[in-house]
């Protein structure tokens, strides 16, 4: 009897010790969701971001080549939407550093309270001499997202190395106390969890000082997600916020800060070594400098092009630093320009797009949202080369240091290519106008 008593006492004491600090697993709303990835400071650094609706006390990614034998940890921040309900969620970010180039990794995210499903991504090849493939679009909502299934299918077939979403998400991310934003991030997860999803802010992200955009996405910007750049293959990509020119209640200093940063970034991209390695410079932002739509006054507003009171206009920088292509959205349509500066066409030497004399502008804002596509003015402006109101998205390929290619996919026409463009350039430098 004494032996039985001692054994029972020992068992109880051991259980008490083991239970001290043990996980209770009582954590509702701790399942990871809204998973998406982006490039870090280098393209073999991948940032993985996701949400939970309770604090999991840890942010962990298990990953590897075929098997998940590695682990990385990060941090989580509490984001509270500015709406009436003040809904909150924990947004987790983990950085996977110094991955192997041109390698497929499998991963899942989570904590002791639960893991996501398994995803994979492929890091880009090292260096500049490889075929870069991208999907580009703007203005995609959680309703009427015509292009989403096509993009999901292409991503699953490994057609893209990067996705550029050129502003306006969900319509809007803050709607219904940010529930629409949550649903949109779930919808794009099949894309954004497998292909780096690079973004810029649009006018529909403005609410509460762009808080949903800034908190939900993790871009490699110097101070925030509002502007940044990254190098991929033979291309230097630059993302800017056109919205700092329109929502000045958040401070004119934002315009100055971005302008100064952009000038410095483009100057660095134009050093002989950098321009030799990555000759193509592509800038993207939400509101276009040029468009010919008739539904509102936006196409006649020139704040980003000429600046406020003639200061901090972005178009002269495009010329000074030889930006090759500028990509916009905002208008729910597709439009391609001839080489263009200050409303004047500067065609190339042997054809419009062979050694063009100015940047080419592309508007690709017809991915699909609850707002309809936007009609055009007639006749077309002299600088407008092609335009369409079909729902769709843009494919881009950078073949090498001299040739890049764009094509517009029409979802209305079941994936038919309705426009295509080769740009051939043998010397990348400031334009001589």
Can you say where each PLM-predicted feature lies in the sequence?
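Classical eukaryotic N-terminal signal peptides for Sec-dependent ER targeting/secretion
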Residues: 1-9
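N-terminal signal peptide
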Residues: 9-26
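Metal-dependent phosphoester/phosphodiester hydrolase catalytic core
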Residues: 24-373, 385-387, 395-433
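Periplasmic/luminal catalytic loop of GT-C fold multi-pass membrane glycosyltransferases
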Residues: 377
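C-terminal structured "cap/appendage" subdomains that terminate the fold
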Residues: 380-381, 390-392
